[in-house]
Amino acid sequence: MSDAPSGPPRLVVGVSGGSGIPYALDILRALRGLDVETHLVVSSGAKRVMSAEGGPQLADLTALASVVHDDRDLAAAVASGSYRTGGMLIVPCSAGTLAKVAHGFADNLISRAAHVTLKERRPLVLVVREDPMPRPMLQNMLAAHDAGATVMSASPGFYHAPESLGELLGFVTARVLDQFGLNAPGFRRWREDEA
């Protein structure tokens, strides 16, 4: 997170229209606990998913964010490369958002901020959740990777013997935060007790 300004680290958190909003909530909680300044952008598709799934709602996410931006605001601070951040994550990252990132199509703030993150060579993490993955989606993952993004699946491990949904979410959260050099407190790593 070397490109972040002095003071607390700063990350952009995009939430797009794939199922998996609880991952975004867990990551925002962890980032708040680590005193990371978060700039939240939630797509209209994500808002529809929240309504349909009945899990975490927009107010739950915005309560944990430092700053909330409208996805239609292409003049927001995070739309400019001169606004320094330590990177961006999109969780969940829908197939449509993945395609936009992979091909440089920036028609909303999430895709514009992702484009800026790539052009400034800052870490960009895309957490995809959709299954199965058709060939175009796999090609878009490769294109996003080749452009500089890290593509991760929202797939928890089980070697830490999770006993709750929170522990499953926490596994993915910890792996995402690893990409930014941040440690999720309480995360049990593979064979860590043997080191």
Swiss-Prot record:
Gene3D superfamilies: Flavin prenyltransferase-like. FMN binds at residues 17-19, 43, 94-97, 129. One of its GO terms (molecular function) is flavin prenyltransferase activity. Its EC number is 2.5.1.129. It comes from the Bacteria. InterPro entries: Flavin_trans-like, Flavoprotein, UbiX-like. Dimethylallyl phosphate binds at residues 159, 175. Keywords: Flavoprotein, FMN, Prenyltransferase, Transferase. Pfam families: Flavoprotein. It catalyses: dimethylallyl phosphate + FMNH2 = prenylated FMNH2 + phosphate. It is an enzyme of class 2 (transferase). The keyword Manganese does not apply. Belongs to the UbiX/PAD1 family. Flavin prenyltransferase that catalyzes the synthesis of the prenylated FMN cofactor (prenyl-FMN) for 4-hydroxy-3-polyprenylbenzoic acid decarboxylase UbiD. The prenyltransferase is metal-independent and links a dimethylallyl moiety from dimethylallyl monophosphate (DMAP) to the flavin N5 and C6 atoms of FMN. This is Flavin prenyltransferase UbiX. It comes from Deinococcus radiodurans (strain ATCC 13939 / DSM 20539 / JCM 16871 / CCUG 27074 / LMG 4051 / NBRC 15346 / NCIMB 9279 / VKM B-1422 / R1). The gene is ubiX.
